[in-house]
Design a protein with these regions (language model features):
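Conserved GNAT acetyl-CoA-binding A-motif
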Residues: 97, 123-136
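Conserved beta-strand-loop-alpha-helix junction that forms the acyl-donor binding cleft
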Residues: 103-104, 131-142, 155-160
Length: 167
């Protein structure tokens, strides 16, 4: 009986859909609220949301690069370079998806958006890695390691975690 109640509480996770968003309320971003929607949309960067009915329950923002950044400044530069290189490669931008922020409005949404994004990247023809640019917090470490990522590198102000894309 108790197990059924717990399972029913997360039943909504079966109905969610990963969608691309044009903008988000950046003040809700607990990791990088200083990054405006312009930043999140320029140079091939993307915002993805997990939609449950009419509600966005989780958000994850990405840049696409060819190297792993150690800071937001490097992320900015590397995604600009990958964007410019994409002009010569029929629009194929970067081989690494860098998740630089994630948040959830509903319990279980953060883990579910990681799962859905992982599946999307796995299906991609050109993306070979899923790496984070995470803050140096216990919460970020617990979240990513619990979801299967391994610590890749500790930087001056950030940590990179990598999700294994192997079969």
């Amino acid at each position: 009986m108790v197990l059924n109640k717990i399972l029913d509480k997360f039943d909504w996770l079966k109905k969610v859909k990963l969608i691309e968003l044009n903008e988000v309320d950046t003040s809700e971003d607990p990791v990088r609220p200083e990054l405006d929607n312009w930043f999140r949309q320029q140079y091939g960067r993307k915002i993805y949301g997990l939609k449950d009915g009419d509600e966005i329950v989780a958000v994850m923002c990405f840049a696409f690069t060819n190297d792993v950044p150690a800071s937001v400044e490097e992320l900015d530069t590397m995604s600009k370079v990958a964007h410019m290189e994409a002009i010569h490669r029929a629009g194929v931008q970067g081989k690494i998806a860098i998740a630089y922020t994630v948040w959830s409005r509903k319990r279980g949404g953060g883990q579910k958006i990681v799962e859905e994004v992982y599946k999307m990247i796995k299906k991609s023809n050109h993306l070979t890695r899923l790496v984070t640019l995470s803050p140096m917090t216990d919460m970020a470490r617990r979240f990513h390691t619990k979801n299967g990522a391994k610590e890749l590198r500790v930087n001056k102000t950030t940590v990179n975690f990598e999700y294994d894309m192997g079969d």
